[in-house]
Amino acid sequence: MAVNKGDFIKIEFTGKVKETGEVFDTTYEEVAREAGLGIKKIFGPIPVVVGGGHLIKGLDEAVIGMEEGEEKHVEIEPEDAFGNRDPKLVQLIPMGEFKRQGIKPYPGMTLTVEGHEGRVLNVSGGRVRVDFNHELAGKTLEYDLKVKEIITDDAEKVKSMIQLHYPSQNMDIDKTEVKIEDGKVIIHMDEMTRFDNRSYMDVTLARFRIARDIWENIEGVEKVEFADVFEKRDMEAEEKEEEVEDAGED
């Protein structure tokens, strides 16, 4: 079965800058370590909706027509990646603006100005030159890409969007329950996600993104409900069960 627009899939990839061969992103932990990248919290196949805006345009188009398990090497021009560089996005900002916020800018520093992320190029003469272009703007990229899985079950599609928008080391996706009935999706998240250090706003935004991708891409779904359930437990019985399991491993 070939991948089509609107499909839920899981992909693996390594992305490089064509000109230098520099690895800038990967789903493989070993590759990240070898490339000296900052280690992500979670590696492994990434779930996406094809055409859902989860990938850059060139990568989104590259997966269409691929089969499950198929691998491909693709080259993506700047206009289908992170765009061409725009000289207007390199700006001079008075040092006083930073001093008022208690910021000491230095070359290479990343910062956010009026909601836009930029990189400090240099600091000179009381002014700071900041580049608001994406760091990969203007670069041709290469990807080694693999379609790991084409997801067909609706409940698994829902779980894939949870993994995409709410990645968590605490979460066991198999302990997340999904029910779909009468046009409504009911999600019981793995209770361990409650221990994530996230703001209320971050949790709300993640849930909105999950819901949006579900109702836009799973036919018949009109409503998504997140259910927080707290159950009384027999803690003593659970501790004994864990002791038995630990003894069995010795």
Curated annotation (Swiss-Prot):
Q: Report whether Isomerase shows up as a keyword of the record.
A: yes
Q: Which UniProt keywords apply?
A: Chaperone, Isomerase, Rotamase
Output one GO BP term.
gene expression
- Chain intervals for the UniProt region annotation (CTD): 157-250
What's the domain of life for this entry? Archaea
List the molecular function annotations (GO) for this entry.
peptidyl-prolyl cis-trans isomerase activity
> PPIase FKBP-type domain location, by residue?
6-94
Key word Nucleotide-binding present: no
Region IF: start and end of each range? 85-136
Spell out where the chain crosses the membrane. none
Reactions catalysed, as given in the entry = [protein]-peptidylproline (omega=180) = [protein]-peptidylproline (omega=0)
Q: Give the EC number(s) listed in the UniProt record.
A: 5.2.1.8
**Subunit-structure text:** Homohexamer.
Family per record: Belongs to the FKBP-type PPIase family.
Domain comment (free text):
Contains an N-terminal PPIase domain, an IF (Insert in the Flap) domain and a C-terminal domain (CTD). Aggregation suppressing activity against chemically unfolded protein is exerted mainly by the CTD while N- and C-terminal domains contribute to thermal protein aggregation suppression. The CTD probably contributes to hexamerization.
What does the protein in this record do?
A: Catalyzes the cis-trans isomerization of peptidyl prolyl bonds and accelerates protein folding. Also exhibits chaperone-like activity. In vitro, can use oligopeptides such as N-succinyl-Ala-Leu-Pro-Phe-p-nitroanilide and N-succinyl-Ala-Ala-Pro-Phe-p-nitroanilide as substrates. The PPIase activity is much lower than those of other FKBPs reported against oligopeptidyl substrates. As a chaperone, protects green fluorescent protein (GFP) and rhodanese from thermal denaturation or aggregation, and suppresses the aggregation of chemically unfolded rhodanese and elevates the yield of its refolding.
Q: What is this protein called?
A: Long-type peptidyl-prolyl cis-trans isomerase
Q: Which organism is it from?
A: Methanothermobacter thermautotrophicus (strain ATCC 29096 / DSM 1053 / JCM 10044 / NBRC 100330 / Delta H)
Upper classification of the source organism reads:
Archaea, Methanobacteriati, Methanobacteriota, Methanomada group, Methanobacteria
